[in-house]
């Protein structure tokens, strides 16, 4: 875990003080004193592993509170586990501290990390800390259990299935716009949705029992629908007039001159961390029908009663 380029005593003592308590005493973490951790097998279960990274100025604004950075890191990873119907239990952390990230900032990050790990029943099993001349960068590898063979993949949709999404769509993108001062957010609700998303772990049993395919909505609803379409070898048709919207999103939409393109913006802005899934038959509680699956390829989108071209389905890093 330590970076050899840093004073060993300082870093080891900081790991012991800030991060060792986050192991929760799990035996396989070895108090963060070893080169690796051990994850014992669990009879009748598959181990699900995911990894996401966040970078300052890309995934959160410069000057963000360190505890909120850590909590968002946990939650974006748990969103992947939620979409796979997995139950989280542990994680590995890699973090690159910039020079401006002082002892108080590192302590704040560790406090936020610990808060959410405890809330979601997870233990820190290991990781690495380094320094960087660039922006703050961190990644989390999250682990979860799912009954053997029960992970819900992107590949699994069938022609005739219903496409549905959980929660509300577009709040994360509007929250980012509010952070940038582009729109008003008087009560801070949209900004809260962007800064601290809620992973939909509550949908685990529904997804295991009823979903044929699923993905978390992180890049943008249209982009993530495209991931399912590609993996399943089928076409997903989305009717954006069916999008479930929050009250702030409804108010924003009503003020836009082109409803169709405004709906496209909501469906492509990302950072919602909801779940898009396909179902054979009725739509379960917690989801709203927004389209259907058919033979073909890609994603077709309609909004405001007309077909609309979508040049970019969501966020892309490259």
Where are these regions (language model features)?
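Internal active-site segments that recognize and position negatively charged phosphoryl groups
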Residues: 158-167, 196-221
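Glycine-rich anion-binding loops of enzyme active sites
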Residues: 47, 54, 89-178
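Active-site glycine-rich loop that binds ribose-phosphate moieties when present
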Residues: 141-152, 159, 185-206
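Glycine-/charge-enriched secondary-structure boundary and capping motifs
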Residues: 1-21, 98-125, 131-138, 143, ...
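Extreme N-terminal cap/leader segments of soluble proteins
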Residues: 1-68, 93, 112-117, 121
